[in-house]
Each structure stands twice: as structure tokens, then as C-alpha cells.
């Protein structure tokens, strides 16, 4: 159950300073220990409850920094990244929420001594709910933000649709043509700002989103940490 911390130097991305590695299912997974966000506890203070945050598809943990920095004042937070940007990236064309739930269960078994507050967004919320249904003793409470849910009939119909049909519809269609490499953080920010989906996000928070979505290449360009092909595989799940 050895857990090692990433000691890479020179990162300009704040959240990456809290990156760790752990072996899950025989793969090198990425997770974040955000306990250092917390200010020192007074001796008279009640210890913060352990919590886990599971992000949505295509969103790195760092893109949630404004939210997580606030949650960290109340909770000792860890966050397992979705498999799309683990160190050992999946090769499957279909990544399911059941698999994400199983990875979360293994992660909590290896890192936690007490039940955690499960917090999740979108597909991460769905996987958190599934994990809690399988292993309720691992969780003390759940906070689910916009979980992706289907009725039984909807799920049956969805699974019967041919891959070619799904690829002609959103969000599959736009993910297929999503630009993954950018000349600068600013160019990616400007692209996001022009999109309707990000209209209500403040300039400050959108800047954080842009910065935390990208990794710098040796030639000075930037690449999305969560690759579109991995995002697509999650949608098929």
C-alpha cells in the first residue's frame, strides 16, 4: 500500500504541487491530497472530516480549485482523478461509471481509515453514488452535484444505439473535433470565453480553468491534460 508523492519541479500549475501516485487495479493512478489547503488547526478545534471529491468528465481536479479551496476550510479533501489523465492512461474506447466506482472504492480502502464525505460532480457524482451503494460503510455523507442519471429504459435504449449514431450527436460530435493543442493559455482562454457553456463563469475563474486544463510542451505549446479521446471514451460509458 505504498503511496508516493510526485516531486516534479518547476510546475507553474498550483494544483499539480499536490499530485500523488497510487497503484489502482494494476495502473499508476493520479490523485490529489489537498490537506495542505487547510490552515493549521488550533488545539481546541474539532478535526475536519475526511472528504473525497470526484470530478466530471474532461475536467481536471485543478479546474475546481475555487470550489475545492473553500471546501478545504471544512474538510480534509483528497481527490482521485478520473482515469482519462492517470499516469497510465486507459486504452479502452469505453470507460464506465461502474469502473470509476470500483476505482474509487479501491482508492478509499488504501488511503482512508474512516468513512468519508463523498462529493462529486457530473459523472464523478454518479460514480460516487454507485460506490456508496456498493460499499456504504466507506461513506458518511454524499453531496452530488448534477449527477448523470438514466432511467432503466433510457439506459437500455442508450446501450442499443450504434456507435456511429452516437458519434453524430452531441456531446460526442464536438468532442471528436475538439482541439487538444494550443499555442498559449490565453488562446485557450479566449476560445472558452467565446463558448456559450462558459458564459456565466467569471474571468478570474475561467482563467483558473484554462490554466489547470493544460500542460506545457517542450516546444512552448500547451496540450489538454484530459485528452479528447479519453473524454469520448467516458461518454460511451
Predicted regions and their residues:
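N-terminal cap/lid segment of alpha/beta-hydrolase-fold proteins
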Residues: 15-29
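A conserved amphipathic alpha-helix that caps or lines the catalytic cleft of carbohydrate-
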Residues: 68, 108, 131-132
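Active-site loop/oxyanion-hole signature of alpha/beta-hydrolase fold enzymes
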Residues: 79-119
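A catalytic-pocket lid/entrance helix-loop region that shapes and gates access to the active site
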Residues: 148-180
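Conserved HGGG/HGGXW glycine-rich cap/lid loop of the alpha/beta-hydrolase fold
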Residues: 30-90
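Polybasic, lysine-rich low-complexity intrinsically disordered segments
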Residues: 2-6
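Alpha/beta-hydrolase
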Residues: 175, 179-237
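Conserved hydrolase catalytic core segment
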Residues: 114-156
Amino acid at each position: 500500500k505504498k503511496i508516493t508523492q510526485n516531486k516534479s519541479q518547476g510546475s507553474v500549475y498550483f494544483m499539480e504541487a499536490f499530485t500523488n501516485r497510487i497503484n489502482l487495479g494494476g495502473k499508476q493512478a493520479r490523485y490529489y491530497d489537498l490537506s495542505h489547503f487547510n490552515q493549521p488547526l488550533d488545539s481546541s478545534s474539532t478535526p475536519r472530516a475526511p472528504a473525497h471529491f470526484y470530478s466530471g468528465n474532461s475536467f481536471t481536479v485543478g479546474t475546481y480549485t475555487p470550489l475545492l479551496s473553500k471546501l478545504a476550510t471544512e474538510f480534509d479533501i483528497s481527490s482521485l482523478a478520473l482515469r482519462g489523465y492517470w499516469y497510465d492512461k486507459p486504452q479502452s474506447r469505453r470507460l464506465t461509471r461502474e469502473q470509476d466506482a470500483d476505482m474509487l472504492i479501491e482508492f478509499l480502502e488504501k488511503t482512508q481509515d474512516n468513512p468519508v464525505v463523498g462529493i462529486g460532480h457530473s459523472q464523478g457524482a454518479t460514480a460516487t453514488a454507485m460506490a456508496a451503494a456498493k460499499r456504504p460503510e466507506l461513506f458518511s455523507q454524499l453531496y452530488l452535484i448534477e449527477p448523470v442519471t438514466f432511467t432503466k429504459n433510457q439506459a437500455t435504449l442508450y446501450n442499443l444505439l450504434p456507435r456511429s449514431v452516437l458519434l453524430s450527436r452531441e456531446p460526442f460530435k464536438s468532442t471528436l473535433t475538439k482541439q487538444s493543442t494550443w499555442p498559449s493559455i490565453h488562446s485557450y482562454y479566449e476560445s472558452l470565453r467565446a463558448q456559450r457553456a462558459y458564459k456565466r463563469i467569471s474571468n478570474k475563474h475561467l482563467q483558473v480553468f484554462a490554466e489547470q486544463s493544460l500542460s506545457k510542451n517542450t516546444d512552448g505549446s500547451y496540450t489538454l491534460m484530459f485528452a479528447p479521446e479519453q473524454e469520448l471514451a467516458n461518454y460511451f460509458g
